[in-house]
A protein has these predicted regions:
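Carbohydrate transferase catalytic cores enriched for Leloir-type hexosyltransferases
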Residues: 1-323
Length: 323
């Protein structure tokens, strides 16, 4: 099988970059003899094209296409979606035309059916996983990362991108809520995040540093009210750190009884539950990137077997509520 894979997001410090790096490595490790993966955004002379993000979606693709749809947060927030303009509307149309759509949770699958009118037969749920670098670190590594970022002995941790003040992530609400334990925010940040009160920002960190930060935290707090998967929560569990989250449907699907949940929007309750969290944390879900890669290879095979010529595919329509 000749796979064209759009890997442009590989260097992105956010979750999309982690997904691309991990699934690419696992796809190569699980490939059948003779299968070839070419990193390109031009799906020529290929049996199947995989765009692992919305930005790489092709409205007209010369070969069977697979798109990974991580969430539909922008589309569900109708006002935000309308402001994104024609470019994003066309990308959603490209998702509708794809031969197969990969999503990380059944929650996103349901959203894709409801908002994009995608047949359930074309959607495959393939969960994500913690990278192999995410494992409990020893006291020496934890002490080193604490010293490097001037962290206290005990702290609550939040991990994610702070490039834009996304309302659904509730980072500002979290920072402003009363708490009895210091809060550390990890991830790439723009100036607005540096104005948040009484928090420590580490900026972007290496994988080894991130694992040590997870391992040294009292708990990971996850205040989002909407997520597609919530990979930091699985990474934290892999490092032995308890997780406390708001009742976002996808987080509940992924974590089940492995986390403590509070009502959406209850930042004080979230922080208090984080301060009361106890080790040892439950293990993460028993799912690996190798499992995800094998499932993805099966999706490629299905896309190739059931693909229709571009000219015979159903004409796309704008998502519900687009205008």
């Amino acid at each position: 099988v000749r796979v064209a894979f759009d890997s442009r997001a590989k260097g992105d410090p956010r979750g999309i970059g982690r997904y691309v790096r991990c699934i690419l490595e696992a796809l190569r490790e699980t490939a059948e003899p003779g299968s070839v993966i070419t990193e390109t955004q031009r799906p020529r002379r290929s049996d199947v094209f995989h765009s692992p993000w919305l930005d790489g979606a092709h409205l007209r693709c010369p070969c069977p296409s697979v798109i990974t749809l991580h969430d539909l947060v922008n589309l569900k927030g109708r006002g935000e979606y309308l402001r994104t303009g024609v470019r994003f509307k066309l990308r959603y149309l490209a998702v509708q035309r794809a031969d197969r759509v990969i999503v990380p949770t059944q929650v996103v699958a349901n959203d894709a059916q409801q908002h994009l009118d995608i047949d359930s037969e074309r959607i495959t749920v393939i969960p994500e996983a913690a990278d192999a670098s995410m494992y409990p670190r020893g006291a020496e590594e934890i002490a080193a990362v604490r010293a490097r970022y001037a962290l206290p002995a005990e702290y609550l941790l939040w991990v994610g991108g702070m490039l834009h003040p996304e309302r659904r992530k509730r980072v500002a609400d979290l920072a402003q809520a009363p708490r009895r334990m210091p809060l550390v925010l990890v991830g790439p940040a723009r100036p607005w995040a540096h104005e948040l009160p009484d928090v420590t920002l580490t900026g972007q960190v290496s994988d080894d540093e991130l694992a040590a930060l997870y391992s040294g935290a009292h708990a990971l707090v996850f205040p989002s009210d909407d997520e597609g998967f919530g990979l930091p929560s699985v990474e934290a569990l892999a490092c032995g750190t308890p997780v406390v989250a708001c009742e976002a449907p996808a987080l509940r699907e992924v974590l089940g009884d492995r986390a403590t949940f509070v009502e959406v929007g209850d930042m004080e309750g979230l922080l208090e539950a984080g301060a009361r969290a106890l080790r040892p944390a439950p293990p993460p879900p028993a799912w690996s990137w190798a499992d995800a890669a094998r499932a993805t290879w099966r999706v490629y095979a299905a896309a190739i077997a059931q693909s229709h010529p571009v000219s015979t595919r159903r004409a796309p329509r704008l998502p519900r509520g687009a205008f």
